[in-house]
């Protein structure tokens, strides 16, 4: 059992509440995954700058009549995106981009309610112990920060250049993955404590867990570079694989030194591609070696990670060579979340076998 798992203790969840709390956390994980999907669709359909104000309470109410719609549309007409990109857009076209951004924002508020109210009830009713309260409170605070980060990102696209900061977009994405991953890990801890068992396996489990820890780190860095690629629209160029600009290592990388790794479109795409290629090699080699070491005792989570890594690299290559179709790019983004989630599952499971 992992150190984090042990820290909860059987007293942290009273009266048989283990499974209920775990199911609630997993439901919140699912809602965050849907939120990430909606956010990706909002970005890919260029809908994210259609709402130019952030009103956490009043913003729940959408335009209800023609007057309301005209008011929202007139505000949008003052933005750089309308002036430089969408000049002449009709009200009907504006409604098309508005609704997706609106749903994205309201879904975020709904997550806050679905997480916050049960958390208060669980804490006040004593159904969770003191050790868990600060952990769940931390998740709630991260969720609140995520709302602010979302608006901080949108604001960057409402001044001069009609595109959000790729740094802020990546931070917004990273926070979503952090919230999702933290809740998932807590749910696994609760379920492991409920079962109250430790499974013994082959002595090589420690080495396998070290490999999985390294792979998880690679997945995280790769998905962060994926956020930079998305923010810079770097997937719209050099749409070939395995060659990039006619070479394995293209010319003119790092034109401005180290900063190019985060700001030059060509270098950023190369970084993401290279990290993805390293990740799939590490995943497959580790998967095969684990099967050789542990045989039939290989955890199901390890097999799931290997298969998902294969699928994810296929989704990434397809997204690139097909020049970022919305449906495939969305699948690739969700594949990243699925792969990270499976890595966390594998890490947790391996920790209980040591």
Swiss-Prot record:
Recorded catalytic activity of this chain's protein: Fe(II)-heme o + 2 A + H2O = Fe(II)-heme a + 2 AH2
Indicate yes or no for the key word ATP-binding. no
* Residues holding heme: 272, 332
Q: Under which EC number(s) is this enzyme classified? A: 1.17.99.9
Identify its membrane topology class.
Multi-pass membrane protein
- Molecular function GO terms recorded: metal ion binding; oxidoreductase activity, acting on NAD(P)H, heme protein as acceptor
Q: Where are the transmembrane segments?
A: 21-41, 106-126, 139-159, 171-191, 212-232, 268-288, 304-324, 326-346
Gene Ontology CC terms, in alphabetical order: plasma membrane
Report the top EC class in one word.
oxidoreductase
Q: Which UniProt keywords apply?
A: Cell membrane, Heme biosynthesis, Iron, Membrane, Metal-binding, Oxidoreductase, Transmembrane, Transmembrane helix
Look up the record and name the cofactor or cofactors this protein needs. Answer: heme b
Q: Which GO terms describe its biological process?
A: heme A biosynthetic process
Q: Which domain of life is it from?
A: Bacteria
Function, as annotated, reads: Catalyzes the conversion of heme O to heme A by two successive hydroxylations of the methyl group at C8. The first hydroxylation forms heme I, the second hydroxylation results in an unstable dihydroxymethyl group, which spontaneously dehydrates, resulting in the formyl group of heme A.
Q: In which family does this protein belong, per the annotation?
A: Belongs to the COX15/CtaA family. Type 2 subfamily.
Quaternary context: Interacts with CtaB.
Q: What is this protein called?
A: Heme A synthase
């Amino acid at each position: 059992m992992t150190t984090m798992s042990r820290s909860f203790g059987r007293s942290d969840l009273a009266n048989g509440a283990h499974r209920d709390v775990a199911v609630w956390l997993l439901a919140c994980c699912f809602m965050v995954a849907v939120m990430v999907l909606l956010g990706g669709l909002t970005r890919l359909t260029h809908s994210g700058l259609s709402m130019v104000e952030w009103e956490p309470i009043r913003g729940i109410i959408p335009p209800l009549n023609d007057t309301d719609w005209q008011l929202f549309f007139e505000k949008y007409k003052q933005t750089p995106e309308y002036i430089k990109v969408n000049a002449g857009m009709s009200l009907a076209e504006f409604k098309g981009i508005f609704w997706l951004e609106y749903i994205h924002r309201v879904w975020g508020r709904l997550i806050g309610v679905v997480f916050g109210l049960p958390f208060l009830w669980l804490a006040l009713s004593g159904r969770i112990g003191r050790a868990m309260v600060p952990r769940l409170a931390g998740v709630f605070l991260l969720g609140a920060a995520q709302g602010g980060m979302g608006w901080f990102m949108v604001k960057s696209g409402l001044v001069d250049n009609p595109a959000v900061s790729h740094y802020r977009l990546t931070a917004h994405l990273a926070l979503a993955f952090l919230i999702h991953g933290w809740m998932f890990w807590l749910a696994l801890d609760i379920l492991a404590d409920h079962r109250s068992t430790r499974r013994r396996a082959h002595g090589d489990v420690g080495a396998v867990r070290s490999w999985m820890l390294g792979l998880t780190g690679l997945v995280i860095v790769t998905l962060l570079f994926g956020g930079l690629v998305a923010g810079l629209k770097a997937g719209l160029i050099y749409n070939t694989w395995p060659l990039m600009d006619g070479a394995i290592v293209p010319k003119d990388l790092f034109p401005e030194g180290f900063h190019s790794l985060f700001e030059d479109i060509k270098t950023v795409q190369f970084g993401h591609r290279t990290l993805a290629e390293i990740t799939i090699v590490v995943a497959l080699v580790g998967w095969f070696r684990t099967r050789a070491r542990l045989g039939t005792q290989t955890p199901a989570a390890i097999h799931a990670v290997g298969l998902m890594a294969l699928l994810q690299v296929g989704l990434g290559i397809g997204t690139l060579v097909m020049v970022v179709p919305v449906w495939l790019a969305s699948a690739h983004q969700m594949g990243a979340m699925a792969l990270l989630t499976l890595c966390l599952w594998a890490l947790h499971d391996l920790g209980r076998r040591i």
